[in-house]
């Protein structure tokens, strides 16, 4: 694996599979927050300590394959340009917070299933991504990496509290489980706000596709746990999975309701969005996300034949500003991005139809 491949292949290998409930659930993510006993928290550490953590991982973990993930590549943020960092964020391989740090780094597995972020809010944040609803499988992989690291270093751990983390809400298991979910039915039936309120009352958090402070572009929401203290990893996963399954049921019910009561209007909306994607010469990222969401819904409901749902997922990633500019070989102005985005979508849909 090389930096060029990571940058030039917009679709991570894990995105190409279809997991359970993939018509509604795009991905499952597990993140484990860990800190080393001998170092200050990342928020307080100096440059020397940050470099020591880089060297520790370079010495003990780079070029040492872990089955079934293969070898890991070390990417230091201060060795990447702003565009490269943005691409990693848009591929969900690092957090926006890590992209903005000077001494952060990331270890990526060959499949990009596993991302180990260094010197973010915590010394180590292990992230594991799976397609569809596969929280338990993602947790199993994350725990395997966690054990691999803990064989070489000593974590900050308290017998009564659990893992010590920079943010109090992560103290305990240090586990943040999240699911990326496509909910156009609930948005169109105007039930989404009520659903979000119920989710929040259950102690879960609803965010946009890039986490805290981001928008829910294309009717895609991220649902995650909030507190970890006093609960086991298995309980956190079970609770989140139960809520997600209820949301899936509500989304399917909403879709059925729209088809029964507003079938022609929905079909018109789907095909109008398809027409925009297939014919536009300029399209902004927000409009593209909305149209892609409509067309994906049309595919799921059988209105549109001959186009793979995965193509829509691919285009949602490919049309992000950073990845567009990476493909172009450098920075683009807003109108240039809109032109290239529209061209890319038209060409990709044309290839799919042929």
UniProtKB/Swiss-Prot annotation:
Regulation: Appears to be allosterically activated by the binding of pArg-containing polypeptides to the pArg-binding pocket localized in the C-terminal domain of McsB.
PROSITE patterns membership: PHOSPHAGEN_KINASE, PHOSPHAGEN_KINASE_C
Catalytic activity: L-arginyl-[protein] + ATP = N(omega)-phospho-L-arginyl-[protein] + ADP + H(+)
Record bears the keyword Transferase: yes
Residue ranges of domain Phosphagen kinase C-terminal in the record: 24-254
InterPro entries referenced in this protein's UniProt entry, alphabetically: Arg_Kinase, ATP-guanido_PTrfase, ATP-guanido_PTrfase_AS, ATP-guanido_PTrfase_cat, Gln_synth/guanido_kin_cat_dom
EC numbers: 2.7.14.1
Keyword Transcription regulation among UniProt keywords: no
Source species, domain of life: Bacteria
Signal peptide: none
SUPFAM superfamilies with a match to the protein in the record: Glutamine synthetase/guanido kinase
Pfam families noted in UniProt: ATP-gua_Ptrans
Alphabetized UniProt keyword annotations: Allosteric enzyme, ATP-binding, Kinase, Nucleotide-binding, Transferase
First-tier enzyme category under EC: transferase
Entry's Gene Ontology BP terms: phosphocreatine biosynthetic process
GO molecular function list: ATP binding; creatine kinase activity; protein kinase activity
Short motif (RDXXRA motif of the pArg binding pocket involved in allosteric regulation): ranges: 337-342
Residue sites binding ATP per the record: 27-31, 92, 125, 176-180, 207-212
GO CC term, one of those recorded: extracellular space
Similarity comment: family membership: Belongs to the ATP:guanido phosphotransferase family.
The protein's role, per its UniProt record: Catalyzes the specific phosphorylation of arginine residues in a large number of proteins. Is part of the bacterial stress response system. Protein arginine phosphorylation has a physiologically important role and is involved in the regulation of many critical cellular processes, such as protein homeostasis, motility, competence, and stringent and stress responses, by regulating gene expression and protein activity.
HAMAP family: Prot_Arg_kinase (MF_00602)
Xref: PANTHER family: ARGININE KINASE 1-RELATED, ARGININE OR CREATINE KINASE
Name of this chain's protein: Protein-arginine kinase
Lineage summary: Bacteria, Bacillati, Bacillota, Bacilli, Bacillales
């Amino acid at each position: 694996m090389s930096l060029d491949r990571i940058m030039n292949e917009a679709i991570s290998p894990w995105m190409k599979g279809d997991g359970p409930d993939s018509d509604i659930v795009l991905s499952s993510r597990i993140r484990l927050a860990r800190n080393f006993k001998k170092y200050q928290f990342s928020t307080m550490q100096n440059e020397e300590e940050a470099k020591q953590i880089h060297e520790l991982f370079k010495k003990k973990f780079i070029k040492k394959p872990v089955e079934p993930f293969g070898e890991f590549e070390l990417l230091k943020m201060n060795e990447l340009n702003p565009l490269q960092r943005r691409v990693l964020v848009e591929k969900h391989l690092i957090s926006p917070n890590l992209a903005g740090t000077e001494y952060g780094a990331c270890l990526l597995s060959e499949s990009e299933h596993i991302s180990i972020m260094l010197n973010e809010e915590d010394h180590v944040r292990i992230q594991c991504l799976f397609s569809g609803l596969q929280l338990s499988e993602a947790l199993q992989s994350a725990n395997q990496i966690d054990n691999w690291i803990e064989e070489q270093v000593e974590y900050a751990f308290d017998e009564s509290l659990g893992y010590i983390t920079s943010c109090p809400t992560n103290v305990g298991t240090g586990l943040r489980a999240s699911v990326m979910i496509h909910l156009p039915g609930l948005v169109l039936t105007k039930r989404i706000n009520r659903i979000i309120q119920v989710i929040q009352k259950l102690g879960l958090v609803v965010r946009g596709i890039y986490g805290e402070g981001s928008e829910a572009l294309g009717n895609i929401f991220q649902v995650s746990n909030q507190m970890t203290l006093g609960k086991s990893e298995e309980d956190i996963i079970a609770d989140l999975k139960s809520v997600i399954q209820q949301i899936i049921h509500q989304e399917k019910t909403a879709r059925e309701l729209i088809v029964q009561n507003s079938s022609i209007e929905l079909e018109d909306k789907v095909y109008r969005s398809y027409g925009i994607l297939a014919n536009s010469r300029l399209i902004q990222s927000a409009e593209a996300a909305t149209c892609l969401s409509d067309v994906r819904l049309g595919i799921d409901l059988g209105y549109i034949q001959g186009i793979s749902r995965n193509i829509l997922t691919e285009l949602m990633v490919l049309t992000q500003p950073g990845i567009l500019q990476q493909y172009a070989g450098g920075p683009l102005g807003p109108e240039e991005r809109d032109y290239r985005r529209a061209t890319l979508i038209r060409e990709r849909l044309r290839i799919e139809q042929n």
